[in-house]
Amino acid sequence: MESTVAHAFHRFALAILGLALPVALVAYGGNGDSRKAAPLAPKAAALGRSMPETPTGDVLTISSPAFADGAPIPEQYTCKGANIAPPLTWSAPFGGALVVDDPDAPREPYVHWIVIGIAPGAGSTADGETPGGGISLPNSSGQPAYTGPCPPAGTGTHHYRFTLYHLPAVPPLAGLAGTQAARVIAQAATMQARLIGTYEG
């Protein structure tokens, strides 16, 4: 009789211990730490909207197969040649705008080309082409097109900046041309990449 009672008591004690142990583990985090565990961050789907992934290669780049950065621009892309835009290669994950100017011009930077609305992604152009999706604005000559380097004789080496800008939104540019439009674009931009070519007057 005593052994039966003892056996029943033993089973009862084990049952109580089995219930108490999970409670203790919850109270102390399962590892002796009484601090509460940080809640898990909700997934994007739980927020009722999908989160876009960060684009790969999200850095602006611009280059040209016709000349290296800091090297002379071939004559065919100047006023002494065919006066056409050089071929360009770029990466603009969010789209952008292109400004080509000459900061060494006598009075103020001379803007040779402005292109807005360049399509997002990587792209390239052949000789004389405008970047995909782009619209040319009037340059310092008042022409909505590319005009090549044509520095005055005897003014030395001029540096031509091919600057690719990221614009979160296209700023108001109606009625603007040349340096005015270029300044507005530069002020509205959040990122830029630059290629420089030279030409001697």
From Swiss-Prot:
InterPro entries: PEBP (IPR008914), PEBP-like_sf (IPR036610), YbhB_YbcL/LppC-like (IPR005247). One of its GO terms (cellular component) is extracellular region. This is UPF0098 protein Rv1910c. Pfam families: PBP (PF01161). It comes from Mycobacterium tuberculosis (strain ATCC 25618 / H37Rv). The lineage of its organism: Bacteria, Bacillati, Actinomycetota, Actinomycetes, Mycobacteriales. Belongs to the UPF0098 family. It comes from the Bacteria. Residues 125-146 are annotated as: Disordered.
